[in-house]
């Protein structure tokens, strides 16, 4: 059975670095989003795409008091309109929406949920959850590696992957929120196995409920604690430790079920069903006979490893550690493969109008562990290895930032080709 390393408390410098990581990522993401959308913050929230689908619950609930007046819905055969998007992201955005509402009231802006104060507050919210996701990635990686490699891994997730795109250009999308939730759930799972405080149990249950409410496909990430436990005795210990904190368990269940109850009330009101697969109402779903796993990771249309090549090395390290039986490599690899195969069967396997197959972002807190292993391995090598790795990382960050700056929505369309992508890469390399 792969052994989970014992919990080692953070050193003082690591606690300081953790706070610095949060502040730097939060400020960089907030400033980047503000610069990206400052020309029209009103349109930033109104733009008709998935972002509006997640956000629309807040103005519909707190301003219009009417769920039938949401703005990005699909009309069903019975004539009713339904939001394809659940309210999980809106629950996480709520504190920042209230800040924006208070600012709009104080400074005389329109109290409509879409004026500039709401937009700036939502940018701040996205930045905070991205930063929190980097912090939980650090804490997870730190459990299985030294502090410095874990810190570098968390920072690289922000600057060298498509996390940056969804922090700056599309901060209202669900993926960075899901990254934080899955990372928090995995971290709390390990703490519950250690012998938890009440807060760990409460956050474990609450984050699990929100993970599924934000993106239902991520339900498989809830297998993490059962898989990483590694034996029946450890699984029994996991549940025993949860039940030992019954007050926290009840509180977590109550908080987690409240938004689910609201969601089911809405579904029943508009469809007559308490549990609804909303995309099915639009004729969208999984096509198991048309799976394209190769295109999901290597296709020119949003192929994960094409647009986030750092993950080639990360997956190589993950597979190696899984072969060696080092925890939690097999668990992380299994969850990554499940996600990969599910997206390969989705009717829109490339998740159009995205950058670098955004579906994998949700798992990046888990993938911070093999990334930290990779960094630790390089740091143990000689000077030439370390210099080569540093130059490679700088090049990957430059490539990531350059492609994000040049990105346009048609990159995921059918007429997007390798030739056109290489032209963009060439422009990044020569600084055009």
For each predicted feature, which ranges?
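Membrane-interface helix-loop-helix junctions at transmembrane boundaries of multi-pass membrane enzymes
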Residues: 7-11, 196-198, 233-253, 316-334, ...
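Membrane-lumen/periplasm interface segments of specific transmembrane helices
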Residues: 224, 228-234, 246-320, 332-343, ...
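Membrane-interface alpha helices of multi-pass inner-membrane proteins
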Residues: 58, 154-155, 200-215, 222-227, ...
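Start-transfer (signal-anchor) and selected internal transmembrane alpha helices
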Residues: 1-39, 122, 132, 142, ...
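Aromatic- and kink-enriched transmembrane "portal" helix at the membrane-lumen/periplasm boundary
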Residues: 111-134, 151-184, 188, 209-218
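Specific aromatic-rich, kink-prone transmembrane helix
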Residues: 136, 156, 177-208, 225, ...
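Transmembrane-helix signature of polytopic, membrane-embedded enzymes
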Residues: 18-21, 105-113, 132-161, 180, ...
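Hydrophobic, aromatic-rich transmembrane alpha-helices
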Residues: 3-9, 134-137, 305-333, 367-377, ...
